[in-house]
Amino acid sequence: MKKIAIFAKVHDPRALAVAEELIEWLAARGVTAHVEEHLSKRLRRTTLAESSESTEIAADADLVVVLGGDGTLIAAARLVGERDIPILAVNLGSLGFLTEITLDELYPSVERCLAGDFEVTERMMLMASVERSGEVVELHRVLNDVVINKGALARIIDMETSVNCRYLTTFKADGLIVSTPTGSTGYSLSANGPILHPELECISITPICPHTLTNRPVVVAADSHIAIKLNYAPDESVFLTLDGQVGMKLLSGDVVQITKAAHVTRLIRSRSKDYFEVLRTKLKWGER
């Protein structure tokens, strides 16, 4: 590996300090670090790193290192896009279901990556589009979830949902979460959605505060085509949020289409813990 892209939480002094140390450590080993321009402006020593626009940082990188929390990783995963580059995610945040590498593991983990000695877990992603009057007006790839949510003063939304062109139900709820297994421990979990092992190939559909109490989360096959048609009064506000980071206002009659993405996010595994240990630790299972 000769080129490593670094994404860091730019408003976190700790992440900036670690990024500076890592850039120097890599330079001493003949490895070029590549950082985003807005990150480069916040680093004190930038001569050892190359910088470019966020969308180009991973263009020809051999590895991506993420320094921050799950939000930083999710943003990086979208920018990596179709390149299938392995991502080493280091947890400098709080919860960190996805960033399972600890700071103490950073340099040993990078050493192994440079030597080609690492394992990856592949996380499925979703493609979400918004169709308006027969035309696609938005198209995005997501790692965690696609969320339809009503505004503060809006009434319950009618969301006519079909799977593979077969009618499922019309959810009458505050919103709907369509999640990957990776995203099942995010917003979906707060809405009583199922916890899905991240290596499963499936999609969960979870209503938010449904009017009908028997509306429960539904899990469908990963290759399913999910279509959600919205119906609500024109003076109400309904929003689409992708991975909690990209959003847009929806209109009544819009159809949100969701399918499995062609590419995956490749996360480097921690050598010191497995997924169930992460669950126990983060959710504090077994504690009183």
UniProtKB/Swiss-Prot annotation:
The active site is at residue 70. SUPFAM superfamilies: NAD kinase/diacylglycerol kinase-like. It is an enzyme of class 2 (transferase). Its main location: cytoplasm. It is found in: Cytoplasm. Keywords: ATP-binding, Cytoplasm, Kinase, NAD, NADP, Nucleotide-binding, Transferase. NAD(+) binds at residues 70-71, 144-145, 155, 172, 174, 185-190, 245. Its EC number is 2.7.1.23. One of its GO terms (cellular component) is cytoplasm. It catalyses: NAD(+) + ATP = ADP + NADP(+) + H(+). One of its GO terms (biological process) is NAD metabolic process. Its cofactor is a divalent metal cation. GO terms for molecular function: ATP binding; metal ion binding; NAD binding; NAD+ kinase activity. InterPro entries: ATP-NAD_kinase_N, ATP-NAD_kinase_PpnK-typ_C, NAD/diacylglycerol_kinase_sf, NADK. Involved in the regulation of the intracellular balance of NAD and NADP, and is a key enzyme in the biosynthesis of NADP. Catalyzes specifically the phosphorylation on 2'-hydroxyl of the adenosine moiety of NAD to yield NADP. Belongs to the NAD kinase family. This is NAD kinase. It comes from Geobacter sp. (strain M21).
